[in-house]
Amino acid sequence: MSIVTTSAAPTAVVKQTTTWERWPTWWGELLGEVWAFLRTADLQTGRNVMVYADDVPNVEVGAEVGEAFASDGRVVASVLPAGRAATTVARGAPSPEGIDAAHRAVIEWCEANGHERTGVRWEVYDHWRDDPSTFETAVYWLLTR
């Protein structure tokens, strides 16, 4: 667990309001929309990202890109949150249980160490590899100060 200063890295995303019940079955479809666009765009692409603006949740699903771009339908230019953030890494193939455990660990660490969270959080997924045990997913929670 650590505190880092993050920068507003550009992303290509689909923004959506959903429910926590629907989310596990929907994120793949939204990510597919983004990658369908990225395959035809002249953009450098990076890792997959998911940003949760609040507990509704209002989400942004997409990927890092090298620069801002003109929006295309539901795929819009955005940025990862910038500022001080508490972070940890979930290791191994991503699973709902593993990602949830990483979020809980950040929350508990922040509460134990007096760091107030804004509610904005995000995940950055490592590039896929043949050996899933080497996969890492970074989990961030933006702090109030």
What are these regions (language model features)?
Residues M1-R145:
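A solvent-exposed interaction/effector surface
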